[in-house]
Every structure is written in C-alpha cells, then in structure tokens.
Regions:
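A cross-taxonomic marker for long C-terminal extensions/tails that follow the last structured domain
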Residues: 287-320
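N-terminal segment of the mature soluble domain
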Residues: 42-131, 236-298
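Bacterial Sec-dependent N-terminal signal peptides
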Residues: 1-24
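Extracytoplasmic/secreted cell-surface and envelope-processing proteins
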Residues: 38-41, 96-99, 140-145, 226-227
Length: 320
C-alpha cells in the first residue's frame, strides 16, 4: 500500500512538472524606461503629421551605453529562468531594418494615411506580449565596517501590455551597498523582488488567455463617400451589421462602442480570442481581417486594414 501511494505521489509530481514546463508564458522585450532615456538624453523628435513629439531613441541608447546592454542582459537571464521567452531589441531591429518594405506612414490610393511611431512598428513587427521597462539610479554609499566607498542602486520595473500600453505589473527596491559594477548590483536587487513580479505577470497572462486580449478597433470610411455606416443592408444599418458580427466573434461578446457617427465608429475594450481556430496567436490585425473578409463575401464591401502597433486597428470601408 505504501509503495502504491509512493508511486502515485511520484506520478503527480511528474505531472505537475510537465504542466509547469508546458505552461504558456508571454514573450517579453526589455527596454529602458522613459525617465531613463530622458535623463540620459536618449530622445529624438518624431513628426506626427506636422506635430513634433519627443520619443525614446532606443537604438542610440543600446549603441552608446554599454551599461544598458549589460543590465538588460542580466534581467533577461532572470526572466528566462522563470520560463519567459525574451526577445533581444538589437536583433529585432536589425531584422526589421533588413526587411523594411513599407513606410512608417501607410497611404491609401485616395491619400488617406495613418502614422506609426518607431515603438509602434517595433511592437507590431517583433510581436512580443509584454514590454519590461527598467529604470535605475545610482547612489553613493559606503560598504562594510571600514566604510569603503561604494554604491547602491534603486530600481523600478514595469511590465506593459503591448496591445493596450497598460502597466500590468510593477516592482521596485533598493540594493545593498556594494563595490560591484552596477549591472551586478542591479541583478541582485531585481532578483530579490522577482517572485512577486512574476506572480503579477502570471496572473495577468492567465486572465488574458481566459478572457481574451484587449484591443481598440476603429471603423471609418474614406473621404470619397462611397459608403457610410448608416447605409442599410437587408433592413439593418451597416453599423448594426458590424455590431452583430462583433458580438459573435469577441470573447463573451465583450466590447464597448464608445463613439459612432455615419463615417466613424470607435470600439474600445474589445476582447478578442487569444488564439484563432488554427491555434495561432491572434492580434488586432488578424481580427480585423476576419471582419474585412466577412463584409467582402457577404455584402460586397471593399475595405482596407491599417494597424498601429499590435493592439489598435483601423478598418477603412469603401476601397482598398
């Protein structure tokens, strides 16, 4: 009987290990925070349709700050030990530049367009789920009884959902004083707080898989006026047709029609399935493409899908 119970316990342990190993974890990318970039002047100007905005210059930061690369590498190792897949910024940017075949601004035949920042493009092309932002400051300190000159580091980690840009997990702390180099001091401080950070990430990702990803979905028409959302099909206005489709294809019919006119509809907090029927990860573009095909096949309505990052998509009706 004891041998039977022992065998049963061993089988249960093996099953738990297998489940832990096969549990899906989000894909991550580690980047410096806005504050870190600004404090070290790693910023640049971006022209957003005539309006100049300041954005982080990650490429210059990784190229010129050797400490940053070491810090990101150390944190990447910690996250990998928890089973996360970590994408490398420099490698992803090199791949993006090699296959750059479209402009940052996509234009229709009629001259309409959508702007996308370099960070939006990175998220869309590299397709990672969570962005880990690291910020740290170095303080002068003394070490040991002999009061040897050293330093301590206070840090903040933030996990950002790349689909919504919402902060979904945080961690902060202060290291003990040390004479080690900053990346090693920071590694120890982050490691001491990693368990809680990992728990926050795991709970959030479990919720996504159960309740769906959250995206923003915009429907609008071209200026040509070939079609509008009040046009009727089989007695229903087009906006009602689209809402019916949204109800059938979102997780538990969850979405919010925040604004609607005859030329534009804004759907927010749209919960899309985590995977499509083929078991592939679904993003905003693939979800909108399903509606585009439905409108084309059922109502002969042409439309074009435009994206901004991973979590915002625009379906423009009336032409391609």
């Amino acid at each position: 009987m004891k041998r039977h119970n022992l065998l049963l316990c061993m089988l249960l342990c093996i099953a738990q290990i297998v489940m832990a190993q096969t549990e899906k974890k989000p894909t991550l990318m580690i980047l410096p925070s806005d504050h870190w970039c600004s404090a070290r002047y790693f910023t640049t100007n971006f022209d957003n349709f005539g309006k100049t905005i300041v954005i982080n210059d990650f490429q210059s930061a990784f190229r010129e700050d050797s400490e940053l690369s070491m810090v990101v590498s150390k944190i990447g190792e910690l996250m990998a030990n928890y089973g996360y897949m970590v994408k490398d910024y420099s490698q992803e940017m090199a791949a993006i530049n090699d296959r750059q075949v479209e402009n940052e601004v996509t234009m229709s035949k009629m001259g309409s367009m959508i702007s996308e920042t370099p960070l939006d493009m990175l998220r869309r092309r590299a397709k990672y789920d969570i962005e880990i932002r690291i910020d740290w400051d170095v303080n002068k300190d003394v070490v040991g009884k002999k009061k040897v000159e050293g330093k301590s580091v206070n840090f903040t980690l933030q996990a950002i959902d790349t689909y919504t840009s919402k902060v979904v997990a945080t961690s902060s702390g202060v290291s003990e004083a040390s004479t080690e180099i900053v990346p090693r001091i920071l590694e120890g401080a982050v490691a001491a707080n990693m368990e809680n950070f990992n728990d926050q990430l795991t709970r959030y990702f479990d919720n996504l898989q159960k309740n769906g990803r959250e995206i923003t979905f915009i429907i609008q028409t071209w200026d040509s006026g070939m079609i509008d959302l009040e046009e009727e099909f089989d007695g229903d206005e087009l906006i009602d047709v689209i809402q019916d489709w949204m109800f059938e294809n979102t997780v538990d019919g969850v979405f919010n029609l925040s604004d609607a006119t005859e030329t534009r509809a804004l759907f927010e907090q749209v919960r899309i399935p985590f995977f499509n029927e083929k078991g592939r990860a679904m993003d905003a573009r693939s979800f909108a493409t399903q509606l585009r095909k439905h409108l084309a096949n059922t109502y002969m309505i042409e439309s074009k899908v435009l994206t901004r990052g991973l979590g915002e998509v625009i379906l423009v009706l009336g032409e391609k």
